[in-house]
């Protein structure tokens, strides 16, 4: 599984980024490394930005340099720290290649939220060796400005709570009406 405390998620990991696997959790992309804690490796983990009410990587923009990501493989728990963040085009596979001498995990999801894949939000994590990482700005393609998905996510939460409130109100009214008719 993968655990990201800053995002409040713990997701099962599946091998292969198929639609079925990504509906169930996060997926290790094909032709990338497995999370075994070895140098010259990059395990690219993809997840939806949110799917059927389950957050998956919805809150990925909360991650900053130095934040912790934990991977539990069948043999051990591996700890990684966020090193840098980029926004890339979906077909820019050069951005997720193995980097010499590094043990990496790269998180990948669509950006902006609910965009259906216009861009990719990429979080590069390196094996935690106890070093402190400097804060970095999010790097983007050709200095293109990308709006944060924070407000879109907040709006979605408000709509959900408002809908719940309306349902509760009408449910209470229905109970009151049925009691008046019955009693």
Predicted regions and their residues:
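Solvent-exposed, non-transmembrane regions of membrane-associated and secreted proteins
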Residues: 1-158, 173-179
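A cross-kingdom C-terminal cell-surface attachment/processing module
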Residues: 163-176
């Amino acid at each position: 599984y993968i655990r990201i405390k800053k995002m409040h998620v713990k997701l099962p990991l599946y091998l292969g980024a198929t639609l079925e696997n990504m509906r169930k959790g996060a997926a290790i992309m094909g032709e990338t490394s497995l999370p075994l804690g070895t140098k010259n490796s990059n395990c690219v983990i993809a997840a939806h930005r949110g799917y059927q009410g389950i957050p998956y990587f919805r809150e990925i923009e909360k991650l900053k340099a130095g934040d912790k990501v934990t991977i539990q493989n069948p043999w051990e728990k591996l700890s990684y720290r966020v090193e840098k963040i980029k926004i890339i085009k979906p077909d820019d596979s050069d951005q997720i290649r193995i980097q010499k001498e590094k043990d990496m995990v790269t998180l990948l999801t669509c950006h902006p939220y609910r965009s259906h894949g216009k861009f990719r939000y990429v979080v590069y994590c390196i094996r935690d060796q106890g070093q402190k990482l400097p804060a970095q700005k999010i790097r983007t393609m050709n200095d293109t400005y990308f709006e944060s998905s924070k407000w879109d996510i907040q709006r979605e939460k408000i709509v959900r709570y408002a809908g719940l409130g309306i349902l509760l109100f009408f449910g209470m009214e229905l109970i009151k009406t049925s009691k008046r008719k019955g009693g």
